[in-house]
């Protein structure tokens, strides 16, 4: 594959596919919408792509729990997905996509060691906050500065036991943490869901499976951002997706 082909995977209830598609395209990828039925009917194949992007939304209405049904629909392709990961190619799951990756256990070689549970506020949280890179594994071009990002979720609180948290820290798998506008770790509302250690996103041990609750695809341009951030030279999304492109 000479070009970097990106699959934007969708099913009933996903959203933000268009924002994801356009962000990937503007960053240099060659994106393509792929419905879960395209895989099931062998019209399209995971191995034909360099990157898989699982967008946000409410897949299958979030029945049972967020991301559970989408993950069940993907489980027949788990062998192909693991080969995709082992080859060094990237999977990105944003919001509902993060929930899907969690259900599949892709951060811990098939083990479901974390949960994304209901926000501490017990309500849907939809607004801007900030995140900061917290790993040296991947996306190092983001540096140490805070980035404004929108969040929109009810079940985004990262929860795990102490042993798993120690593993995440030891293996440098916490990729993003919520911060305030000065880059300091802070509680609600900057941490919109009460995630342990302000975790906004994690990776697998290799750094090529990334799950995050915030939506960089919604702020590709500065005018999509809030307050003084609208005066930035580039939107958070452009910075994120261009660095992602260079990492793949």
Swiss-Prot record:
Compartments where located: Cytoplasm
The EC number(s) this enzyme carries: 6.3.5.3, 3.5.1.2
Single biological process term from Gene Ontology: 'de novo' IMP biosynthetic process
Transmembrane segments: none
Pathway the protein contributes to: Purine metabolism; IMP biosynthesis via de novo pathway; 5-amino-1-(5-phospho-D-ribosyl)imidazole from N(2)-formyl-N(1)-(5-phospho-D-ribosyl)glycinamide: step 1/2
An example molecular function term from Gene Ontology annotations: glutaminase activity
Major site of localization recorded for this protein: cytoplasm
Organism: Picrophilus torridus (strain ATCC 700027 / DSM 9790 / JCM 10055 / NBRC 100828 / KAW 2/3)
UniProt superkingdom: Archaea
NCBIfam families, A to Z: FGAM_synth_I, PRK01175.1
Protein name: Phosphoribosylformylglycinamidine synthase subunit PurQ
Gene name tied to this protein: purQ
HAMAP family for this protein: PurQ (MF_00421)
Reactions accelerated catalytically: N(2)-formyl-N(1)-(5-phospho-beta-D-ribosyl)glycinamide + L-glutamine + ATP + H2O = 2-formamido-N(1)-(5-O-phospho-beta-D-ribosyl)acetamidine + L-glutamate + ADP + phosphate + H(+); L-glutamine + H2O = L-glutamate + NH4(+)
Native organism taxonomy: Archaea, Methanobacteriati, Thermoplasmatota, Thermoplasmata, Thermoplasmatales
Domain (Glutamine amidotransferase type-1) ranges: 6-248
Entry keyword set: ATP-binding, Cytoplasm, Glutamine amidotransferase, Hydrolase, Ligase, Nucleotide-binding, Purine biosynthesis
Quaternary data: Part of the FGAM synthase complex composed of 1 PurL, 1 PurQ and 2 PurS subunits.
Active site: 95 (nucleophile), 215, 217
GO cellular component, one term: cytoplasm
Coiled coil residues, start to end: none
Disulphide-bridged cysteine pairs: none
């Amino acid at each position: 594959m000479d070009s970097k082909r990106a699959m934007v995977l969708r099913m009933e209830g996903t959203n933000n596919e268009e924002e994801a598609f356009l962000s990937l395209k503007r960053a240099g990828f060659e994106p393509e919408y792929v419905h879960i039925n395209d895989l099931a009917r062998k019209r399209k194949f995971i191995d034909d792509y360099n990157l898989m992007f699982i967008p946000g939304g409410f897949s299958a209405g979030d029945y049972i729990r967020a991301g559970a049904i989408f993950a069940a629909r993907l489980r027949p392709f788990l062998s192909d997905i693991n080969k995709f990961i082992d080859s060094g190619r990237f999977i990105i799951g944003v919001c509902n996509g993060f929930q899907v990756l969690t259900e599949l256990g892709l951060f811990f070689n098939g083990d479901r060691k974390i949960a994304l549970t209901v926000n501490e506020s017990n309500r849907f949280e939809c607004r801007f906050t900030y995140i900061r890179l917290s790993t040296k594994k991947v996306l190092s071009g983001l540096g140490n500065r805070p980035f404004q990002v929108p969040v929109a979720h009810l079940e985004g609180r990262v929860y795990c036991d102490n042993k798993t948290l120690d593993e995440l820290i030891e293996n440098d798998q916490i990729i993003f943490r919520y911060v305030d506008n000065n880059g300091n770790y802070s509680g609600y509302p900057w941490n919109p869901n009460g995630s342990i250690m302000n975790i906004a996103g994690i990776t697998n041990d290799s750094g090529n499976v990334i799950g995050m609750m915030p939506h960089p695809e919604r702020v590709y341009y500065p005018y999509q951002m809030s307050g003084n951030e609208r005066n930035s030279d580039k939107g958070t999304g452009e910075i994120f997706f261009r660095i992602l492109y260079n990492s793949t």
